[in-house]
């Protein structure tokens, strides 16, 4: 929790570029905070894990910005996100003498829904959040805040023949 919120929010960013297009960096920040707090990879978040607040989160986002920087059309390719987050982790390893290894693999929109559900639910069942880029959705009105947007999938719910994701 960051000042009562689950995860960060790019609306907090005072840097205009990050405020408009920093969802990829915010998702990476949230991922690193989760891994630091719950998976023992404490050096991935260089601030106090017990006293997280918006100011520290904004500072962290500025550290992440050179790795996953906003672009004119956003961080529109998952491999960009993966490669740059791997670079951040590699730099943390070099700087802190750690050896964090995180296997990240792209699953894109060409796969089928059943496979996506299996992958996402499998990661959540392992207590690992899933960075997710939604470029389009058939229901543009209902999901307008998620179109062309990175976010973190942190849970799911199954009801009969449907699975719903919980996001941060």
Task: Label every PLM stretch briefly.
Residues 1-84:
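Active-site-adjacent structural segments surrounding the nucleophilic cysteine of cysteine proteases
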Residues 58-168:
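Conserved active-site-adjacent core of cysteine acyl-enzyme catalytic domains
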